[in-house]
Amino acid sequence: MVVARNWRSAGAEVDLIVQKEDRVRFVEVKVRRREGPLSDEAVGPAQRRRITRAAECWLDSHPGIREACVTIAWVNLADDTVRWLDNAFDG
């Protein structure tokens, strides 16, 4: 279930927050209008820090969440596909 869209806090934003039971995904959506490779570099270090900060703020106000991850969704409008990368910032 989508619990928030464009959630903002502490000068940071998460595109989507999706929750299923006690698990949460913080989703960064990247849209591409033409064909070509989708790069992991589309989310740079500064943006990663902002997304992480927003996720931490949200989690601070929602105790009881046992699992959380950041997911990147690459939407390619040229061929109507979506590619998901879970645990995007783990490394």
What does each model-found stretch correspond to?
Residues 1-9:
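A short acidic/basic microdomain associated with nuclease active sites
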Residues 7, 29-31, 87:
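Active-site donor-binding loop signature of nucleotide-sugar glycosyltransferases
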Residues 10-12, 78-79:
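Short acidic/glycine-enriched loop/turn segments that link adjacent beta-strands
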Residues 12, 23-25, 71, 83:
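Protein kinase-like catalytic core scaffold
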Residues 14-37, 51:
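Conserved catalytic cores of phosphodiester-cleaving nucleases, focusing on short active-site segments
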Residues 32-57, 61:
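Mg2+/Mn2+-dependent nuclease catalytic core
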